[in-house]
Every structure is written in C-alpha cells, then in structure tokens.
C-alpha cells in the first residue's frame, strides 16, 4: 500500500507541535511516506502580503504537491492547521487528485477550544465530514463529534502519549510529582 502523511509547516513551535511530530515519527517508522507542503501559516497576520501568499498556496502550491502522490491509497492529515481557507483547499485537492482514503488525526477541535460561534463550528464539521476516517482522542470527543453531525467513521485512540527517548526509570518515587500534559505558556497558574 502507498501510505502518505501530509504535513503543513507550523511556524509557531509550541507544545502543540510535539504531538504532531510524534505522530509523524510513529507513522514514518511504520512505512508512511511524508509529503511536506511548504506553507507557512501565521493566523494572526492579516496583511495583504499574507492574504496573497495564502491565496497562492491554496490555488497553486497545494494542488501541485498533492498531484505528486496520485498513487496514494491512504493519506493521513493531522488536524488542525489553523487556516480554514487552506483546509478548504487541501481536502478538495486530495479528493480531486487521488483516490486515497483521507484519514484525519484530530489533535484539537477548535470549536470546543476557542471558536464557539455557529459559523466556524459548521465549517469545522464540514472539514471533518470530508474524511473517510477520523482518529479521535477518546469516546467523549467522538460523542461530541457525533452530536455535531460528523458522519465520518471514527476510531478512538484512547491513549494520548508522547514519544520519549529516555529509558523508563521504575525506581522513581512519585510522592510529590506533577505531570502536566499541555502548553505551559497558555496556563494560568
């Protein structure tokens, strides 16, 4: 099988990128080929230059890149990428230029996390409904997606883990340890 992982560059290297990097690592170790699309997304940049770049990327860069993997059987994409415009160009390019199954691995659902207005939520659910398969964190997320009328097949990961190259130390005492799985910069403590 020809399995591909499509990646979009993320200029903001925060804790959210760690999970995506780990999925990339695990899938490439399992034989997936990477297709890195050279798009830099700065969600806060609303300048004319940024809008022109986004337009060019959506109409030229993405279709050109996707045409390189016409032989794909499965394409995995890690969601979100923080640009609805780019997502709305990427998914149709995959559907038009390949016969691959589109598998979306969800890291965050922005409608839950930040944008709770109906318009954004509907756009996000349309994106997710374009998938042939969604990999969700757990049953709670899956139930929420089903309540929002996401009809794609959903599989629960049921485990959220990071790659750690360190040898497991079984002699540690965890009497006063704190383990925080999140972005410290966004935390209020």
Positions of PLM-derived features:
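N-terminal pre-catalytic "stem/leader" segment of glycosyltransferase-like enzymes
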Residues: 1-89, 95-101
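Short hydrophobic "strand-cap" motifs at the C-terminus of beta-strands
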Residues: 8, 137, 180-183
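Helix N-cap/beta->alpha junction signal
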Residues: 16, 79, 108, 138-139
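Membrane-proximal helix-turn-helix segments that form the acceptor-binding/catalytic region
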Residues: 66-70, 92-101, 117-134
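Alpha-helix capping/helix-boundary segments
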Residues: 82, 140-142, 185
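A short, histidine- and acid-enriched strand-loop-helix "catalytic/donor-clamping" loop
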Residues: 102-118
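Donor nucleotide-sugar binding/catalytic pocket of nucleotide-sugar-dependent glycosyltransferases
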Residues: 132-146, 150-167
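Conserved catalytic-core segment of nucleotide-activated headgroup transferases in glycan assembly
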Residues: 170-189
């Amino acid at each position: 099988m020809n399995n591909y992982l499509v990646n979009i560059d993320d200029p903001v290297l925060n804790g959210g990128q760690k999970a995506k990097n780990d999925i990339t690592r695990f899938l490439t170790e399992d034989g997936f080929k990477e297709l890195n699309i050279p798009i830099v997304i700065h969600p806060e940049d609303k300048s004319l230059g940024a809008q022109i770049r986004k337009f060019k990327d959506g109409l030229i860069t993405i279709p050109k890149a996707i045409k390189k993997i016409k032989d794909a059987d499965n394409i995995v994409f890690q969601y979100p990428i923080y640009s609805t415009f780019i997502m709305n160009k990427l998914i149709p390019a995959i559907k038009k230029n390949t016969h691959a199954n589109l598998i979306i691995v969800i890291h965050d659902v922005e409608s839950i996390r930040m944008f709770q207005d109906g318009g954004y939520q509907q756009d996000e659910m349309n994106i997710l409904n374009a998938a042939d398969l969604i990999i969700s964190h757990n049953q709670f997320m899956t139930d929420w997606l089903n309540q929002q009328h996401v009809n794609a097949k959903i599989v629960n990961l049921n485990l959220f883990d990071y790659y750690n190259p360190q040898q497991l130390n079984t002699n540690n005492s965890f009497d006063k340890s704190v383990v925080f799985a999140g972005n410290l910069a966004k935390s209020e403590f």
